[in-house]
Amino acid sequence: MGMPVEFNTLIVTKGKEVRIDENIFTLEKDGYRVYPMEIPMDVRKTKFGEKSGTAEVQKLQWEEGRTIITYKLTSLHSVN
């Protein structure tokens, strides 16, 4: 039996990101997801919303049907 997995090329936060340090955040998502590591990608609050920044995923964890990413915000386009 295969494992369902989703490949993502942008980070959609839906306002659920948690600040760990000045520009380091974690985000927990349902299901197993793959993100490019250490590659700049857009950060958005919603899938079709405006770009709020650019980030690079530094750590990717899978556990109990969830994905946890740790990413570094490299630029901010909006404070709202």
UniProtKB/Swiss-Prot annotation:
Top-level division of the source organism's lineage: Bacteria
Cystine pairs: none
One Pfam family named in its UniProt record: DUF2584
Gene3D superfamilies associated with the record: Hypothetical PUA domain-like, domain 1
Official protein name in the record: Uncharacterized protein YtmB
Annotated organism of origin: Bacillus subtilis (strain 168)
Gene this protein is translated from: ytmB
